[in-house]
A protein has these predicted regions:
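Extended amphipathic, helix-rich lipid-handling scaffolds
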Residues: 14-15, 19, 123-140, 268
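Leucine-rich, highly hydrophobic segment in Treponema pallidum outer-membrane-associated proteins
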Residues: 1-110, 248-328
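Alpha-helix boundary/N-cap detector
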Residues: 118-125, 129, 133, 170, ...
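Intrinsic, low-complexity N-terminal interaction/targeting segments
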Residues: 23-27, 32, 134, 140-144, ...
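Short, charged N-terminal helix-start/capping segments
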Residues: 78-100, 131-155
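Short secondary-structure junctions and interdomain/linker hinges
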Residues: 7, 81-84, 103, 117-121, ...
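Single conserved position on a long alpha-helix in the C-terminal lobe of the eukaryotic protein kinase
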Residues: 1-2, 96, 142-250
Length: 328
């Protein structure tokens, strides 16, 4: 089964333990923002390398070595149809999406992950304290109306935002009233810290006591209200990532199902990358020999009995593709 197809040029083996050390020579700080997905991954990938004039595609298998790694909560799940990217603004620089099949079985895995970090008792206590203080049962609120996908994303203007999709946003809005303060008609803030982390884990660790808005069966949150106002403006005006040529081009070349999906838009993240990468490397990345012609980077992981089926796509810019095809 390891035979390469005719277009494959090579077999690539990536030890993600050595990757952060390698990238620290290039990156001016700890891997964060769009590169944080490569931090602490403790994984090994075996990938077939497929190169054409419009893309580099790597396909194969990733094994996450550390059983306490957050990614392993997804390694034996069924791949899900990813749709939460439909609400992302056009100026999204990068995103990471996580998709599960069913919350309650997954929550057991999350509890084990918390226990391995020695955070389970603290989290249980937090929920009990909130339940007592507000005379409610948090387990009947977020878990009940969470559908199956969560996302964190960063805008070209550096703001970081998180979101989950919902089965009934109106109902959740009502149930969160006692736990919330009104900032304005659309934007609220959570009164208690740590709720999102308790129910979803690592992606929402930095959204401790966020502002949030619920719109069209999405709960969207950020650490300041102005970020959500900017999000709502993009969303209501249909200025969306899924309408951009670069995103359309990349998504057309990949399966729509995954459990973890990571995306970087080259143009939208150029300013963020410049702040994070030493200047000589940045100049090379932006050169013709570097990544200048490429529009996006996508990294998809789909659960497969404890390991991940993997797709990595580095896709050429859509306008360059059009020029190339006109020249044919």
């Amino acid at each position: 089964g390891d035979k390469l197809n005719k277009n494959s040029l090579a077999q690539l083996h990536v030890n993600f333990n050595t990757l952060p050390a390698l990238l620290k020579n290039i990156v001016a700080s700890k891997l964060n923002g769009e590169l944080s997905v490569l931090n602490d991954q403790d994984a090994f990938a075996s990938l077939a390398y497929n190169y054409s004039k419009d893309k580099v595609l790597l396909t194969g298998t990733t094994i996450v070595n550390n059983s306490d790694n957050y990614y392993n909560l997804f390694a034996d799940l069924q791949a899900q149809k990813i749709s939460i990217q439909n609400m992302l603004p056009a100026n999204t620089a990068s995103y990471t999406i996580f998709a599960i099949d069913s919350y309650l079985p997954w929550k057991k895995k999350l509890n084990n992950w918390m226990a391995a970090k020695k955070e389970d008792k603290k989290t249980t206590q937090l929920i009990e304290n909130i339940n007592t203080k507000y005379h409610l049962n948090l387990d009947d609120i977020l878990p009940r109306y969470f559908k199956n996908q969560m996302v964190t994303f960063q805008l070209s203007s550096t703001e970081k935002i998180g979101a989950i999709n919902l089965s009934n946003g109106d109902k959740l809005t009502q149930l969160l009233i006692d736990l919330s303060n009104d900032y304005n008609e659309e934007i609220k803030s959570l009164n208690e810290a740590g709720i999102l982390y308790a129910y979803f884990g690592r992606p929402f660790e930095n959204f401790k006591k966020p502002f949030y808005t619920i719109i069209d069966n999405y709960m969207v949150f950020a650490n300041n209200a102005a970020t959500l106002e900017a999000f709502l403006s993009s969303y209501k005006n249909n200025q969306l990532l899924i309408s951009t040529p670069s995103y359309i081009s990349a998504s057309n070349q990949l399966p729509g199902n995954a459990n973890i999906s990571f995306y970087v838009d080259h143009a939208n993240s150029a300013g963020l990358i410049q702040k994070n990468i030493y200047l000589p490397y940045y100049k090379h990345l932006q050169s013709e020999e570097g990544l200048k012609k490429y529009g996006s980077f996508t990294y998809q992981l789909s659960g497969d009995g404890g390991k991940f089926q993997t797709n990595i796509l580095i896709n050429k810019q859509a306008d360059i593709l059009q020029k190339d095809s006109l020249a044919l």
